[in-house]
UniProtKB/Swiss-Prot annotation:
Complexes and interactors: Oligomerizes as a right-handed, spiral filament on DNA at oriC.
Upper classification of the organism: Bacteria, Pseudomonadati, Pseudomonadota, Betaproteobacteria, Burkholderiales
Protein name (record): Chromosomal replication initiator protein DnaA
Renumbered residue ranges of the record's region Domain III, AAA+ region: 253-469
PROSITE patterns xref list: DNAA
Region (Domain I, interacts with DnaA modulators): 1-73
Main localization (coarse): cytoplasm
Record-linked NCBIfam families: DnaA (TIGR00362)
InterPro entries for the chain: AAA+_ATPase, Chromosome_initiator_DnaA, Chromosome_initiator_DnaA-like, Chromosome_initiator_DnaA_CS, DnaA_C, DnaA_dom, DnaA_N_dom, DnaA_N_sf
Organism whose genome encodes this protein: Cupriavidus taiwanensis (strain DSM 17343 / BCRC 17206 / CCUG 44338 / CIP 107171 / LMG 19424 / R1) (Ralstonia taiwanensis (strain LMG 19424))
């Protein structure tokens, strides 16, 4: 067993970045191997590492075990706080040919398409610790900017966290924590345990905390049919059918799969990503609040989950909450119904990081806006980080109190634009690699050229292509892709015509449709006309001469000039890029 783990660790060290190996693989230790059942048990020192290794590396470790023993091996990951101490004994350099079977050949057997041992998202060039520091456009790179913390920052002997499951609106009560205690374990004492209760379902989270804090956290939410005030006390009742689990990500509602590592970066989102990394490394100190806006499926949610996951890696005790705006509204309503606003406030006002998605859903919800205003003020005063996403710029949101709008504007506001062609291709290739499927580059370019709006549309198209290829037993080619997406491409081509583009642009820029064909050259007419030509080239299959004919019989060189000019300006002008995105979304319905 020791020989296996030495060889497996050596192989994983070759496949991973130094930071990934040091953080996730080095603390593991094999516990036992059953020769009869071929069952292998591997221990992790704390719950956070256990959950992450199971989700990200279990497949590769299982494959290495099967290859080593040349049999079907089942791998079980278990929790053992002493694992790190024993792990060092297994981390000696592996000797060539020491495997029981084919282990000495493992570095030739990484799963195709991943380049990183068979699991998605593990690419050295994209890891924060392995790439050049990020700098905001126009600024020099900052020392240490964009780096992951050292392995020591992940902490050994971390507490085990329990959390409720199946309850997205759960609100465990918590006492406010002084700003000085944040980032240092939030005032928790390693020897003190206390049940942390879920304010919606009455479920329990087992956490470690300071005795003084424990006395302030005695609220237990009522079960259904129970009077709100009957829940006070330290009891441990639970809703029937709900058992507490112990994944820190579920308690924070973070998706552990969404990280900076597997976030594809391009011109459209590089500023947002750089700002997100800066916030993740310095929460509450810069860019507070961070406000990200853009259309659906552009990566806003992925980015804010990445921030939360990075903070959890630095400090697993951090109080983090990801919540959609509609769920926050629901929390406010339930707190009102149960007369539990004190507990509601204690929880939300004591967070270290609040990630709230799609804030535009607060529109018209006056009581929710009032409660969020108080929470926002409390968090900022405590130097906690607030991150907000929306589909539009703060001042363009309707039905939101001016006080909130001014708070949203007080930090850093960054747009995430639709991905450019190269980025769309990169996204498709990375998604395909995650599925262990080889998609030819020309196919990725074909799909990216025809589908421009957002990442979800690209993912949906890729799934259709893969399913069509599997069902019909055909290799993925442009012809197969065209057949798989024929309905989608037909709908797009049918909906978008040059005439429709001209009308939409004329309405958007408040000119007459007739101006699209005229010879008038004032800037307020020529500019929209050039934009319409650009969109006609991008969104239809018309040739340059055909487009020129539809714009009053203009020469194809005039159309080409307009297309090149708008394309160049789009890459430099955020406002123009935003306008074009709005027009594209309008035309695509």
């Amino acid at each position: 067993m020791q020989d296996f783990w030495q060889a497996a660790a050596a192989q994983l060290e070759r496949e991973l970045t130094p930071q990934q190996f040091k953080t996730w693989i080095k603390p593991l230790a094999p516990v036992a191997f059953d020769e009869e059942t071929h069952a292998l048990r591997i221990a992790a020192p704390n719950r956070f590492k256990l959950d992450w290794v199971k989700s990200q590396f279990s497949g590769r470790i299982t494959a290495l075990a099967c290859e080593y023993w040349e049999a079907q091996v089942s791998v079980q990951f278990v929790l053992d706080p002493a694992a790190s101490g024993r792990a060092a004994a297994y981390m000696q350099p592996a000797q060539p040919g020491m495997g029981a079977g084919g282990m000495d050949r493992m570095d030739h057997h990484a799963a195709p398409g991943t380049g990183m041992g068979g699991y998605p998202g593990a690419q050295p060039a994209q890891t924060m610790g392995g790439q050049a520091p990020f700098a905001m456009p126009g600024q020099p790179a900052q020392p240490g900017y964009g780096e992951y913390p050292t392995a020591a920052a992940y902490g050994l002997g971390q507490p085990q966290y329990g959390h409720p499951t199946g309850n997205p609106a759960g609100m465990p009560s918590a006492a406010p924590v002084p700003a000085g205690a944040r980032g240092q374990g939030m005032g928790q004492h390693p020897g003190q345990h206390h049940p942390q209760h879920n304010a919606e379902l009455g479920e329990i989270d087992v956490v470690q905390m300071d005795p003084a804090e424990a006395s302030a956290r005695s609220y237990r939410a009522p079960q259904q049919g129970q009077h709100p005030h009957a829940a006070m006390g330290n009891g441990a009742a639970q809703m029937p059918g709900h058992q507490p689990s112990d994944t820190v990500h579920e308690r924070s509602r973070l998706n552990p799969i969404l990280t900076f590592d597997n976030f594809v970066t391009g011109k459209a989102n590089q500023l947002a990503r750089a700002a997100a990394i800066q916030v993740a490394n310095n929460p509450g100190k810069s860019y507070n609040p961070l406000y990200l806006y853009g259309g659906v499926g552009l990566g806003k949610t992925h980015l804010i989950h990445s921030i939360g996951n990075h903070m959890l890696m630095e400090n697993p005790r951090a109080r983090i909450r990801y919540i959609h705006a509609e769920q926050y509204v629901s929390d406010v309503v339930k707190a009102y119904q149960r007369k539990a606003f004190d507990e509601f406030k204690r929880y939300y006002h004591s967070l270290d990081l609040l990630l709230i998605d799609d804030i535009q859903f607060f529109s018209g919800k006056n009581r929710t806006q009032e409660e969020f205003f108080y929470a926002f003020e409390a968090l900022i005063a405590n130097r906690a980080q607030v991150i907000i996403t929306s589909d539009t710029y703060p001042k363009e949101i309707t039905g939101i109190d001016d006080r909130l709008i001014s708070r949203f504007d007080s930090g850093l506001t960054v747009a995430i634009e639709p991905p450019e062609l190269e980025m769309r291709v990169a996204i498709l290739m990375k998604k395909a690699a995650a599925e262990n499927v080889n998609v030819p580059e020309e196919v990725a370019f074909f799909v990216a050229k025809h589908l421009r709006s957002n990442v979800r549309e690209l993912e949906g198209a890729l799934r259709k292509i893969l399913a069509f290829s599997n069902f019909h037993g055909k290799d993925i080619t442009i012809e197969v892709t065209r057949e798989a997406l024929k309905d989608l491409l037909t709908v797009q081509n049918r909906q978008i015509s040059v005439e429709n583009i001209q009308k939409t642009c004329a309405d958007f820029y408040n000119i007459k449709v007739a101006d699209m064909y005229s010879k008038k050259r004032p800037a307020n007419i020529a500019r929209p006309r050039q934009i319409a030509m650009y969109l006609a080239k991008e969104l239809t299959q018309k040739s340059l001469p055909e487009i020129g004919e539809l714009f009053g019989g203009r020469d194809h060189t005039t159309v080409l000039h307009a297309v090149r000019k708008i394309a160049d300006e789009r890459s430099k002008d955020a406002q123009l890029n935003h306008e074009l995105h709005v027009l594209e979304q309008t035309l695509k319905g």
